[in-house]
Swiss-Prot record:
GO terms for biological process: biotin biosynthetic process. It comes from Cronobacter sakazakii (strain ATCC BAA-894). The keyword Cytoplasm applies. Substrate binds at residues 22, 82-83, 143-147, 235. Residues 15-242 form the AB hydrolase-1 domain. This is Pimeloyl-[acyl-carrier protein] methyl ester esterase. It is found in: Cytoplasm. It is an enzyme of class 3 (hydrolase).
Amino acid sequence: MNDIWWQTTGEGNCHLVLLHGWGLNAEVWRCISQELSSHFTLHLVDLPGYGRSQGYGALTLDEMARLVASRAPECAIWLGWSLGGLVASQVALSEPSRVDALVTVASSPCFQAGADWPGIKPEVLSGFQRQLSEDFQRTVERFLALQTLGTETARQDARVLKSIVLAQPMPGADVLNGGLEILKTADLREALTAWQGPFLRLYGRLDGLVLRKVAALLDARFPDSESQVFEKAAHAPFISHPREFCDALLALKARLANR
């Protein structure tokens, strides 16, 4: 079996697994890992097929979750950004006893827009899939640019994301298509109502991929969960607002310790 790239760092007494989003790799967390490493034992992961976890083809959401969970500590907080939020959610549903808390960042249990659901239009996701086969590099860059659009530091943040992608091996087109297929088809809205553990959802108000309307809808659907919206952030709040982002995680850790 191919190996998943996994790095453990930090000296905190609380394990925190960090899962990145589509097209990227674990280097996205470098802007906050130093700050968090004195409070958590961090588990930095390249999802199967991404970055240094080469040798995988397109996977289903369940397959990806099972592969990542097989390497994880017995108990941890699971944090997933964007596509990684779906993977973390699937782990929480499949192995709830191993998840101390679920944190989703700029993520949705259903990314695709529907008649009564805000999300990414189906034709946009299909367009990205089609464009991947025509101009691989440009399609990835376009998707990255969408993630920072609207913020005060949009260009700078987009450059950070691009450098992260280029610093490690690129995922293959089949892996990227598989990830887009998960974003098109996954719908965990009903399944996540069964999750009984702590659930923190973090959003950027300027996010053009996961609209802020999603936060309010999920507040109603998951009344025991908590949500926080970073007012001037877009799809990558940990890059544009690292201090506030870390504060939210430290506050969660404190709440868990006082349970």
